[in-house]
Every structure is written in C-alpha cells, then in structure tokens.
Amino acid sequence: VSHFPSCILFTVYNKDLEHKYHTISENHSFPAPLVDAIFSETHVLRIPNKFSLAPLGEHDYSSHFSINFGTDHSIATQDSELFTIVYEDTPAEYTHQLVNPHVTTDIDILYHFASQRGYANGLYFYHVENQVTIQAWKNGQFFLANRYAAENEDELFYYVMLVVDQLELPPADIHFSVIGTKQQHTSYHLLFNKYLSPLHLCNREQVEGTTDTTELAHFFGKCVL
C-alpha cells in the first residue's frame, strides 16, 4: 500500500515479485477485490510525507518535527541506522483492514537503497506532487535528506544544484540518479547534462501505463519485498 497525500495505491505481487494487481483510491477506501484476500506480507509505504531527521534514542521527538512544521500534526517515528525519521502520521481508513502491516517511509527505503550502492559521492532524487525529494552522499558518508517545494523544472533544477553547491559535491564525479518515469528521466537528463554527470534511472523496469506515482510505488514496493 503506497500512501501519497493525494491518493492511495494498492499493489499486489506474487511470490516471484511479479506485478498482479493495481488500483488507485483517491478517497482512501479499501478496494473491494482485496477485502477477503490473504497476503503473506503487507507493507504500508508513506510517500512523500512531511519529515524531519533526529538523533537516535530520544524520548520525545515532537520538537524535531514542530520546529519545521508546527505543532498541529500527528507524528510517528521510524529508526534507521544513523537517525530517527519523524514523519507526519496522517490517518487512513484502510489500515484497520490490514493484518500486521509493516509501515515504512520512502526516506528510509531510499537511504538503504543508496547505501547499498556504495558510491562515494551520490545524489538521488524524485519529483512527485510538486515536491522534489533529495538524498546526498559525500566521501562515502550520508549527508542530506530533504524535500523542497518544486512546481516546475526550474525549481527542481535550482534545488538539486543548491545541494550540489552547498555540499561541495564534485559535479563530474557524482553518481546522479532519479526515480521516475522514462519521460522524466529523458527530460531531466537534458536539464542537467551540461552541469552534472550523466543521469541514471534507478527503476529501469517500468510499469505499463505508468505515472510518477505508480513508478515510485512500484520502485519502493520492490525494495521492501
């Protein structure tokens, strides 16, 4: 289950990780064909929620979130290897119909995906619902995870290059990657090809009839299965 602010994507895979069922709910209702279904694993992926990173092991994480987003939010936490992800825990009517769901965030999934690649300098990004999410690595160390409001390619370009400049990443020696559709990859490659290393597409296996939301749901879903 991929939980976006604007919609919920329900996707079913078989034991061989083949894509078997997919539907989109814009009113957060549970799909009728899945009501009586039994699954060996159930995952809920939160994409792209408001979030803050905080040190591990603290008793109260509310201040880390409120300093960026105010106090009028319900929050949840997820521990990663280096930090705790404090994210907005928006309610969803469908959750009571799931059995023992594993809840995780896109931030945690992308962190593990990138760390396993082992590139000394890396920048990974994706754009959905007028936000660009960026994670950056420098000299083999994790340096940044953030989201920026980006309604168009000019704003996306600005924030990607801002991260490169602020972290002093070497433009010609960076593993530069996007998660998205093939059309997005082509467009962003042209946007950045004079400034950064060639842009890689993380999710080369595309879903038929794809959109940015379905591609992100498919990519993150395959990462956790």
Spans of model-derived segments:
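Hydrophobic/aromatic-enriched cytosolic interaction surfaces used to assemble or bind macromolecules
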Residues: 1-225
